[in-house]
């Protein structure tokens, strides 16, 4: 583990390779799972504030799910998440050209919304767990992302490089520069770990 500020980072984030391969997976991460996308404090409010711009891109079933359940729900583990359509796919899912992706992000990409998408989606395959005095960042290895691991290996893209924009969005440029410095120190052997 590496610590930067109040963030504890798993070595897998430096060592594992990952690069989404939408042509292969078709955005299945928006469909599969036990609950909706985890939401950080304030994200449900950002969805609500931008909903008028997001809604035109949503499927009718997604709109119905939001109208019935709300912009967010609390899952079985007590976490705030996006609502689901019939307990399966995210209410904010859209399908284009045979791929699933996010109505929230589509509105943002067109300059119509100020909210890009939940940071938990943007940062996947990193999952962040909040503790009293720190955050723990771990690499999540979901079976449906096997193609992303393969593509990441083939292209030599570490998780932290693939997620540069998301990590900067959450933690800032200076934090990301420190992360890259730690990665170089690990790579050159200046930081060693007993394994």
Describe the role of every protein-language-model region.
Residues 1-195:
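Short loop/turn segments that flank or connect secondary-structure elements
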